[in-house]
Amino acid sequence: MLPAGHRLRSSGDFSAALRGRGSVRAGSALIVVHANTADARAGQLPRVGFVVSRAVGGAVVRNRVKRRLRAQLAARLHRIPAGTDVVIRANPVAAQAISADLGREIDRLLDRVLTPRTAARA
């Protein structure tokens, strides 16, 4: 379970993380990870949100996918820098994925979106 202070809640927060200035995205067949570090949030807790659409499946399947993603990310909160908002969007294939696969994808994609862009180019 994610602590309350680490959750994205408002649609404005989701929009800023998905499309805001400085947002970064990396994706795979299972999930897409968006991250945004806003100067206004410097020093605050990292926040995480999940987007699991009806394309993933019915309500039971969507909730199962969200539970698995939440559990995987709760164990990785320490890797997310302070002031960073992360949104994880599940693709339909995520409904058949096991937790270990989701965890590996989260690790790989978090590394890609959280690596500073200047270091990535060098």
Regions found by a protein language model. Give the residues of each.
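Positively charged, solvent-exposed patches that mediate nucleic-acid binding
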Residues: 1-122
